[in-house]
Each structure stands twice: as structure tokens, then as C-alpha cells.
Amino acid sequence: MQTLIFEDALCAQLSPLAAARPACSLSIGSVTLLERLLPFGQLLTSLRPHLRRYLEQLAGTRAPLWGGPAFAADGISIPAAAARPAETQSRYGSLLLVVNARVVPSRESLLTLRSIVEAGHRGIVRTPSAVAAALLHCSPTHDGPDDRLLQMLLAGTAAADTTELLKAHDLVELDAMVDMLEWPHELVSFHELALAGSLAVRLDSGTYAELRPGLFVAPEAHVADEVVVRQGPVVVEAGAEIGPFVCLDGPLWIGPHTKVNPHAWLRAGSAIGAQCRVGGEIEASVMEPFSNKAHDGFLGHSHVGSWVNIAAGTITSNLKVSYGPIRLPARPGHPAGRVETGRQFLGALIGDLAKTGIHTSIPCGATIGVAATVSGNVPAWVEAFTTTLSDDGGLPSRTTGVQAATGLERMMARRGVELLPADRDLLQLLAENA
């Protein structure tokens, strides 16, 4: 069996969170869609051109900037140890599961996709505006209509092509439904709904020891005796270190090799990715791998990309003074204008490689672009590759791809990760198109 994850035109609308990474590599409820689909067998991707080029250059030499599974030179993900491709291949043979990269990787989505595969009926799952998934039957001789469709999907150069190719193919509509992302703030909403189920899936593996009621710890993790667990589940992955006098409220996930500094308060609904450094107060937020929020400050109802540094004293507002619903700022050149989130609590949406200065204040619903640098009182919208020092009264300045790569190289060195030419080329391309 094979699985193809494809990006459609609306993936770009998830920027800044999905500007420098595939939408299927965004974390929701402690897991990405790509990780959810690894057990389904050999995994292929059809991504936006700049990401396709990046992964081709990377050619499996290292995991991509955003962490997670590595990719081989042909764009096929290298399966994790938890995957069972041989078993899946023998059971489902020539089936091809096609999944939109914007599908929410919840436990419910996983069960729906599994049921589609188990039933084995060739068909398509639609939403009013998109194709969510499809199941195709490939031929043993690789010359059937679904085989030809697969080759066209893999060769596609425009995101819209994939959706149109699937819609035009002769497929029966399947009676199934999965949640899909449309706007970046929905990552916060779906994360809140998915985290408990995601942790339940992890705990079902039986690899965690319950050190005390509600605290589940993987081997080689260290939790100081003085840590307080007020409610569970709190799941701590291998190699993580939690210092003394930390307060933990579940549901909470702490990723592999992440360090939690003494006196931190990690509140319910948070998921801290691999190799992060965290301190202060964090509530109902996602931090993608390799990011820092090591000092006092508050991060609430936010989504933070990879290789982000949140400096000491940085505070995100997550509730309006009026207690009213929060709106996302209007995107330059986008016809939608301001986006009604319907959320009373919403912090910041921070793209990969962004940085804040000390004592930075970030308003509700702020959107901070890839490789942006902010300090002082931050505006609601910050373009990618800009430096916005609002307290000096000046206009934002541009950050070049070379400058962003230099800063990233220094940050990577502290994690023992090498910056590769493919990383530099990706940043240069993103900077040129910012």
C-alpha cells in the first residue's frame, strides 16, 4: 500500500505557519499528519514547488528544518521505527490512499482514514471547497488509470492541479468526513480538541511508566522530585529533562530531549516539541521542535514554529480587554480582509525562525512571519523577513536570506545541527518572495 499527501491551493493560506514547511508537518495534538500516516505504508508527497525543491536538495541527508521524519531523494518519507510498511503492504497491496495535507491529524481522522482503507472501496471524500481524501486502486502492472493519475499527481507543478485532477477522475463519493484546516488560527482550535485523544494514542503503546498519578514518563527522561502534577495526563518523552519546582497541568505533552527550566508553569492544553527549551508560563500552546522560550514571560493559546527564539519577558496577550471575539489582521493583498476567528482566547501565530527581543508585547491574534524579528509593542501583522523595532519609531527593515541563514546557523550550532546548502537555498527563496 502507498499513501500520497498532497498540498492544495489553500495550504498557502495557512501562512506564516505553513510558509516554510508542508502543511502536513504542522503539529496538532502532539503529532503531525505526516507522522499519523507513516503506519499506512510507503509515503509519497506532492508539495508546493519551493518545498519540493528543498526536499529534493536535502535528499535524506538530514531531517528537514521543521524536524520530524527525514525524506529520501525521491520525496518518499523514510519510515519511522513505529511504522509497519511490510504488514500494511501485504494486507492492502495495490491500494493508494490520497490525503490532503490540510486534514487535521486527530484520532478521529485517523480512524476515518483507516476505515476507508479497510473497506477498500475506490472513491473520493469531498468538502464543499476541497478534496479531503481519495482511495485509488493501482494495477500490479502499473498501467491502469489510477496509476496514470498517480504519476500526474506526483509530477504536478501547481497545487490547484492536484485538486482538479482528483475531481475530474471517475471516483464515487465516499460517505466519510474529516476535519480540515483553512485558516492558521484553526491550528489552535483543533489542537485543543485533539490533544487528549493524541495522548491517549501514545499511552496505548504501553511504553510509558506512570511515576505518579497522571504523570507518564518514557525511558531516559528525567523529572525532578520537586515537580508538581496538578492534573493529568502529562506525557514526557525520552530524553526530556524537567527541573525542580515546575508545575504541570494536563493534558500536556513534552517532546523528546526538551528541557523545562525550574519554576516553569506548563498549563493544560500545551504541546512542547522535540529539543525545545522552555520556562515561564505556557498555556494551551504548541511549540514546534527546536524552539526556545527559556525565560519568564507568558505564551498563551499560540502556535510557535521551529527555530524560534522568544526572549525573556516576552508576553502574548490572549484575551481582549472587552472579552470579545478576536479577529486576525487583514493580510496584504488578500481579499478576505480581517478574519473572524470566533475565539475569545487567541495569542500569537509565529512562523518558523522568528525572534522576539526582551520585554516584547504581542497583541491578541498577532501574525508574525517567517524569519521576522520583533521587539517592543508588536503590530498585529508582521511581514516575513522584516525587523520591526516598534519603539524606535522607524519603519521595518528587511532581513535578507543570507542574514536569516547566518542567524539560523548560530542557533543550530547550539543544538548540534549543521546548516546545509539546501537550508540556505530555501531561506533565500523565501526571502526573495516575502
What are these regions (language model features)?
Residues M1-G214, E220, T386-A434:
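Terminal amphipathic alpha-helical/low-complexity segments used for targeting or macromolecular assembly
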Residues A18-R21, V227, T341:
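Short coil/turn segments at secondary-structure junctions
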Residues S205-G305, K320-V321, L349, T367-I368:
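Extended beta-solenoid/beta-helix repeat architectures
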Residues I5-A9, A159-T163, R230, L248-D249, ...:
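Short, flexible segments with low predicted structural confidence
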Residues M1-C24, I28-L33, L37-Q42, V236-P256, ...:
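Solvent-exposed, charged interface segments at domain starts and junctions
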Residues L10-Q13, S25-S27, P262-H263, R277-A434:
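Glycine-rich hexapeptide-repeat left-handed beta-helix
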